[in-house]
C-alpha cells in the first residue's frame, strides 16, 4: 500500500478524503508531489509539462511531444528519468508477438501524482480562490467519473492475476492491454498454457450485457492470435445491469465488488 493512503480516513467518503487530505492547502498531501519532485529533480518545468500531459491521458511519444512542445531528444531524456524514478511506466501492447519499439506508450504509475497533475497542478490558482470544498465541486467532480473509469481499467488489469489464483490457474502469464491500428483491448492475459484472456472494462452503467459482449467479440476477432490460442472472454463492470439478461456461455463477468473481494480475501 502506498504510504500516502495511510493519511486517508476509512470513515470518510472518497470525496471527503480528497477535500480534506489533498485539496486543502494545509493538508500533508497537498504539497507532497511537489516535495517529491523537488527532492529528485532539477529544472522542474519540463517535468511538470510531461507529467501533466500524462495525467490528461496523452501516452504516445507523438502525443506527448505535441502537448509539451519538447523536442524528441529532450522528451526521451525526461521520460527515461521519470521511468527510472518509478513515477512513469513504459508500456507495450501485450500479444504473442514481440512488441515494436514504435508501439511504446507511457503512463503515470503513481496514483497520487496522477490525481495531482490531473486536477490540482493545472488549477492551483482557481482551487486557492474557491477553497477545497467548492473547488472539488467545480473542478474535480465534473471530471471524476471519467477519471475513475481509467482507474478502473488499471484495477481490472491488476486483479487478473488474483482471478487466475482463485481459478486455480498456475501457468506463467503476462498481463497488460493491447492497442493496434484497428483495435484496443482493455485487459489482456497471455498464458503459457496456450490460452489468452481478453477483457472489456465498463465503469458506466451497463444497459445491455449482450451488447457489451458483442463489442468484446468484435475485439476478439481483431486481436492478433498468431499461435491460435484459446481465447477467454471477460467483462469487468462497476455493477451488474439492473435487468439480468440471458446467460452468455463462455463469458466471465466480474463486478467491482468481486474485485474488492479479491483484494480483501472476502
Residue ranges: model-predicted function:
Residues 4-184:
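Accessory nucleic acid-recognition modules appended to NTPase machines
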Residues 119, 186, 209-210, 245-247:
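Short, well-ordered secondary-structure micro-motifs
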Residues 160, 185-205, 216, 233:
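Conserved catalytic cores of phosphodiester-cleaving nucleases, focusing on short active-site segments
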Residues 95-96, 205, 240-242:
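Conserved nucleotide-binding/hydrolysis micro-motifs of P-loop NTPases
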Residues 204-222:
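Mg2+/Mn2+-dependent nuclease catalytic core
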Residues 125-127, 168-172, 184-185, 195-199, ...:
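Extended hydrophobic-aromatic, low-complexity segments
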Amino acid at each position: 500500500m502506498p504510504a500516502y493512503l495511510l493519511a486517508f480516513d476509512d470513515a470518510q467518503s472518497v470525496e471527503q478524503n480528497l477535500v480534506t487530505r489533498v485539496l486543502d492547502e494545509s493538508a500533508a498531501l497537498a504539497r507532497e508531489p511537489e516535495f517529491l519532485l523537488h527532492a529528485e529533480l532539477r529544472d522542474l518545468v519540463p517535468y511538470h509539462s510531461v507529467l501533466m500531459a500524462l495525467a490528461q491521458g496523452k501516452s504516445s511519444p507523438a502525443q506527448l511531444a505535441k502537448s509539451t512542445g519538447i523536442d524528441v531528444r529532450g522528451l526521451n531524456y525526461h521520460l527515461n528519468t521519470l521511468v527510472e524514478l518509478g513515477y512513469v511506466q513504459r508500456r507495450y501492447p501485450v500479444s504473442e508477438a514481440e512488441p515494436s519499439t514504435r508501439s511504446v506508450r507511457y503512463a503515470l504509475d503513481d496514483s497520487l501524482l496522477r490525481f495531482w497533475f490531473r486536477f490540482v497542478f493545472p488549477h492551483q490558482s482557481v482551487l486557492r480562490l474557491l477553497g477545497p470544498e467548492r473547488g472539488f465541486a467545480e473542478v474535480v467532480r465534473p471530471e471524476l467519473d471519467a477519471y475513475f473509469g481509467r482507474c478502473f481499467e488499471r484495477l481490472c488489469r491488476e486483479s487478473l492475476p488474483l482471478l487466475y489464483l482463485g481459478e486455480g490457474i498456475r501457468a506463467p502469464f503476462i498481463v497488460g492491454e493491447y492497442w493496434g491500428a484497428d483495435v484496443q483491448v482493455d485487459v489482456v492475459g497471455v498464458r503459457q498454457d496456450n490460452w489468452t484472456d481478453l477483457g472489456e472494462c465498463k465503469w458506466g452503467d451497463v444497459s445491455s450485457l449482450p451488447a457489451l459482449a458483442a463489442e468484446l467479440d468484435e475485439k476478439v476477432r481483431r486481436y492478433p492470435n498468431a499461435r491460435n490460442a484459446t481465447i477467454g472472454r471477460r467483462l469487468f463492470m462497476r455493477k451488474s445491469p439492473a435487468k439480468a439478461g440471458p446467460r452468455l456461455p463462455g463469458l466471465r463477468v466480474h463486478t467491482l465488488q468481486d474485485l474488492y473481494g479479491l483484494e480483501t480475501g472476502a
